[in-house]
Amino acid sequence: MAKVLIKKLNPNVELPVYKTSGASGMDLMAFLEEPIKISPNSSYLVPTGLSMAFSEDYEVQIRPRSGLAAKKNITVLNTPGTIDSDYRGEIKIILFNHGKEDFIINNKDRVAQMILTPVIKMEFEETDNLPDTLRGEGGFGSTGK
């Protein structure tokens, strides 16, 4: 288990928890002074009232909650959202309403999930040629349905 420092930006904020022993992520809750409305085809930057610090070997990914996506057409717009190890500001979630009805978020509603994942840094080696593959440059549906 990796150590993550977490800071409540308000004493009324509740900390995220794993809901089951097999859960990969923890639900993040909205921290709001009053309910907000996300209209269809609109987004909103939802505050959580939390900030964190963790090792540079990791990132926190912000992902949609499957229930909100399946039942209400609400998703995290930049899925997965990345929280870098050197970011110390408030964690905020860009929610988007793909549905046809207004979506209301109340204080402490669970709106997304966060997952701690390892980061493997890249080292580039510039080249004029890449190794051939059977697929080649085919993309965007080139392998069939």
Task: Annotate each predicted stretch with a short phrase.
Residues 1-145:
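DUTPase catalytic domain/fold
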